[in-house]
């Protein structure tokens, strides 16, 4: 299949079962809400090296937050509810509670529950107090600035991680411009792109010649290794490859994000759009690119 002059490779992205949670972080103004959002999602690009994957889902107007203040919604993904709970506790404690004027609320009503505020409250050293709002229990933790308000527990639900597209271009500038255009339209509700501004240049493959490494450079897609690596997946005129990885709360949201990205990236100078997979042996989801483009998302 071809869009404009770009070939959509007849292949699939291999995605994985994960667990996801949503934080709603509010603050006195947008500046501090974003500061907390950026901090809590730092070093969270891949579960391989970061224990979780996280990103800002959206900026929220006061009408859309529990306390009527500006906010951000943040999605965080891991391999188990317990793992997600641990990462929430660590990151909220170090990156949200520390940020001036913030509060942190659960953004998922369904799924399983993990205790977060109910554990973080002990930072209050006995001075913490609970607060009931309807059937919602929150904790007021005294801090030097005033109080930090947080939900006792957060929802965790089954999710999908590792959706991806590979953008193969004739030169670095054209490829980056296509990836930027794709990333911009791929940010939809229920989805994050966990890498820097959504784009990955150092795609990986499982395993390595070095036993200590669980992953290593995806040599089949490295233009500089054409001719020296055992095999290449690159057409002769490809000089740059960039990847976009997608995590979502549902398979449907990941598929829709990928569909939008493929259409946005296709243009002159982009030779192919492909996807990373492991032969269907590791992931539980196989998302075929041609089906997405044909509208069967």
Each predicted region: which residue ranges?
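Conserved mixed alpha/beta catalytic, RNA-binding, or beta-rich assembly cores of soluble enzyme
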Residues: 2-62, 81, 86, 90-241, ...
């Amino acid at each position: 299949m071809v869009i404009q002059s770009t070939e959509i490779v007849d292949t699939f992205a291999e995605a994985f079962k994960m667990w996801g949670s949503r934080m709603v972080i509010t603050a006195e103004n947008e500046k501090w809400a974003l500061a907390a959002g950026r901090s809590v999602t730092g070093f969270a690009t891949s579960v391989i090296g970061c224990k979780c994957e996280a990103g800002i889902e959206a900026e929220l107007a006061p009408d859309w937050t529990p306390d009527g203040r500006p906010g951000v919604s943040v999605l965080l993904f891991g391999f188990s509810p317990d793992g997600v709970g641990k990462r929430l506790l660590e990151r909220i404690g170090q990156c949200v509670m520390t940020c001036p004027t913030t509060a942190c609320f659960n953004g998922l009503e369904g799924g399983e529950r993990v205790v977060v505020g109910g554990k973080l409250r002990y930072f209050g050293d006995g001075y913490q107090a609970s607060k009931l709002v309807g059937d919602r229990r929150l904790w007021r933790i005294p801090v030097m600035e005033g109080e930090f308000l947080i939900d006792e527990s957060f929802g965790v639900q089954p999710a999908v991680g590792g959706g991806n597209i590979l953008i193969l271009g004739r030169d670095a500038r054209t490829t980056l411009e296509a990836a930027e255009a794709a990333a911009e339209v791929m940010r939809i509700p229920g989805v994050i792109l966990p890498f820097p501004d959504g784009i990955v240049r150092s795609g990986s493959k499982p395993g390595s010649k070095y036993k200590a490494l669980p992953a290593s450079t995806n040599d089949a897609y490295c233009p500089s290794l054409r001719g020296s690596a055992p095999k290449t997946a690159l057409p002769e005129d490809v000089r740059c490859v960039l990847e976009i990885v997608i995590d979502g709360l549902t398979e449907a949201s990941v598929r829709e994000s990928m569909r939008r990205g493929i259409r946005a990236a296709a243009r002159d100078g982009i030779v192919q759009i492909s996807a990373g997979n492991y032969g269907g042996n590791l992931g539980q989801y196989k998302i075929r690119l041609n089906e997405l483009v044909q509208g069967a998302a």
